[in-house]
Amino acid sequence: MQTLFKEVTPKRYANGNEMKENSSNVLDQYFTRPSVALKCFQKACEVIKKYENLDDFIFLEPSAGDGVFYDLFPKNRRIGIDIEPKRDGFIQCDFLNYKLPTHQKVICLGNPPFGHRGVMALEFINHARNCDFVCFILPMFFESQGKGSIKYRVKGLNLLYSERLEKNAFIDFKNKEVDVHCVFQIWSKKYQNKKSEFSWYKNRHKEPFGEYIKVFTVSLAKNRECGKEWIFNQKASFYLSSTFYKSIQIVESFEEVKYKSGIAVVFTSANKALNTKLKKLFKEIDWTKYASLATNSCYHLGKSHIFQALYDHLDILKDN
């Protein structure tokens, strides 16, 4: 179950700034559709069994709600926890105060409360960090690769797997479908994903891929004005809109950037063949696979997404 409620303790962003209360998150509830829960459970089993024998684990659902995940677990190896249990068999407890088993291997799987900008979900993950695997439905903030991403505050766990959930993955208390953009992620205490990911958080004080390009945020949107040097005084090699729906266009001037906000890309190499290859690469990349998906179904593109795309295609650039 997903429960969003008023938080008493002040929460903070990755940069340390205190969060403001979001009144829309007070006493709101929705539940994971059974078919979606089944897909998440099956994916968790598929990924984990590559590393361990599933028979060695007990399964734990925190914030169990109506037990949509709990009912999928082996009957003799399952624990359900909820602060307000809706059925018999669950342990009545705030998961953040629950003492996790230390003598058994544990897979923690479920849909924790998100809280404002995912901070409560972060607390659930960090409390579960002594579990062998943590498999949670999470807000899209956990997909972000920006330097302030909340996922860089996960302690003692490694991200093994992440996928975006399908549309209408939830139902409300009236059994009506609810479409909230979320991801399903699998974290491990012991194992790491062999596919490396570019971390802008670790490179935030550097100029990533400076041998190829420099990237600037440019905007004339109200209260977001920035990068005016590359709007009025200098011309970038090309521009991209930072907000788009189905596809994105590479344009030659800021005037063509949609919504007055975008990214200016400036070549740093004098190698014309390399620059041509770079521009072609930017046109061919499926940016929906890199950009962040917002609740209104639009995509937001930032520096971190561009750096990840370059990181994934370095072999093409180096073969020059």
Give the residues covered by each predicted segment:
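Class I S-adenosyl-L-methionine-dependent methyltransferase catalytic core
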Residues: 1-320
